[in-house]
């Protein structure tokens, strides 16, 4: 499916001030960037602009500031340094976003140089999409580029605001994300196997519904599986469950059956007597979960069942872990799925969030066809929803 918005290729950026909303929301501990995936993902757009003599002004959020001013642990300064290191470019940083210092730093940017502004969320008006914020940011540029796919589903000041005042186009990452995630559902090579995990049915209901409409096989794991067990009349002990969603889960099972879509649920589970890293796993069948145990991961027989389905696939979409993969004792299921997807002869799309963390944890990122940088944005796109950030851009 062709991208329907203008991109940086479609505009003249030579000598222009190009304001770029990137997604540099990366993990930082003690001033050190832990995962550079999102920084690297922004490089094609940044490099293109530098090569075409643009004056590049980058803005992003980092973490969840209170919006009451500077918080040192959430400053983008370490990210700016990491960007310079990864790109080899001349990157400046200004510890300001909307004030005089920022305006002066923007005015000093020369063609082919890069400036990183401070965290846009240090001001609470950013989240409210305050027009004053939008106007201020727009005053820094001649052109606006949105390349932050991870925040494209949020109608916030730095995401949609400048598009009201400047010619607004997409960066290469945004274009690729939208193309890939919409394309996989428009014309997937079959068999198309979708894998959905995570804790709650309620948070993935739209995604599950959409996948039943497009996939050949839907694999379900993680905490949400126990709500489906309840819909089948099984007992789940102390496992995570959403009583209010049992009926809806049952309706989805019925819908899948009517459409000829195969739904695979765990046939065995790793359970424990408490939730914790020190919990000792026991393997039990799905119809024999003890009342005093809670499910923490899929079991070994389920791993084989799921891996076999993945092996036959030509297209795989995966979002959400199979268990509490942060605990080593309960990471087996997620690792088994990650390895199966990596080994399969298929187009593999990893749909953001915890699945990306899992793929990175098991060092399998380079074996996947596409790893999305968006969590919520990926899911909303998969559900068929319009993303406010994309909607605000100029039509091609």
Q: Language model features by range: what are they?
A:
Residues 1-396:
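Active-site loop-to-helix "anion-binding N-cap" substructures in soluble metabolic enzymes
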């Amino acid at each position: 499916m062709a991208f329907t918005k203008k991109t940086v290729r479609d505009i003249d950026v030579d000598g222009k001030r190009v304001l770029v909303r990137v997604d540099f929301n990366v993990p930082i501990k003690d001033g050190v960037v832990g995962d550079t995936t999102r920084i690297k993902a922004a490089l094609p757009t940044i490099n293109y602009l530098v090569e075409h003599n643009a004056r590049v002004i980058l803005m992003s959020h980092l973490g969840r500031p209170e919006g009451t001013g500077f918080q040192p642990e959430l400053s983008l300064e370490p990210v700016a340094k990491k960007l310079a290191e990864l790109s080899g470019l001349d990157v400046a940083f200004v510890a300001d976003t909307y004030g005089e210092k920022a305006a002066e730093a923007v005015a000093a940017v020369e063609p082919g140089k890069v400036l990183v502004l401070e965290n846009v969320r240090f001001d609470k008006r950013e989240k409210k999409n305050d027009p004053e914020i939008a106007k201020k940011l727009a005053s820094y540029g001649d052109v606006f580029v949105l390349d932050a796919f991870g925040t494209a589903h949020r109608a916030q000041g730095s995401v949609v605001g400048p598009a009201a005042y400047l010619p607004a186009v997409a960066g290469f990452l945004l274009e690729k994300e939208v193309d890939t995630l919409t394309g996989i559902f428009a014309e997937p090579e079959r068999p198309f196997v979708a894998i959905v995990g995570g804790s709650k049915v309620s948070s993935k209901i739209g995604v599950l519904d959409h996948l039943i409409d497009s996939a050949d096989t839907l694999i379900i794991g993680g905490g949400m599986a126990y709500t489906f067990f309840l819909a089948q009349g099984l007992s789940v002990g102390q496992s995570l469950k959403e009583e209010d969603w049992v009926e809806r889960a049952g309706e989805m099972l019925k819908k899948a059956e009517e459409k000829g879509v195969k739904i695979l649920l765990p046939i065995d589970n790793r359970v424990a007597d408490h939730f914790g890293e020190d919990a000792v796993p026991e393997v039990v069948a799905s119809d024999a979960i003890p009342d005093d145990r809670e499910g923490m991961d899929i079991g070994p027989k389920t791993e084989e069942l799921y891996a076999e389905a993945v092996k036959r696939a030509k297209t795989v979409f995966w979002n959400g872990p199979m268990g509490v993969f942060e605990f080593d004792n309960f990471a087996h299921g997620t690792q088994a799925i990650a390895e199966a997807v990596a080994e399969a002869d298929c187009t593999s799309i990893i749909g953001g969030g915890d699945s990306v963390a899992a793929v990175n944890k098991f060092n399998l990122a380079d074996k996947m066809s596409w790893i999305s940088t968006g969590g919520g944005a990926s899911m909303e796109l998969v559900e068929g929803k319009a993303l406010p950030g994309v909607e605000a851009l100029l039509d091609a």
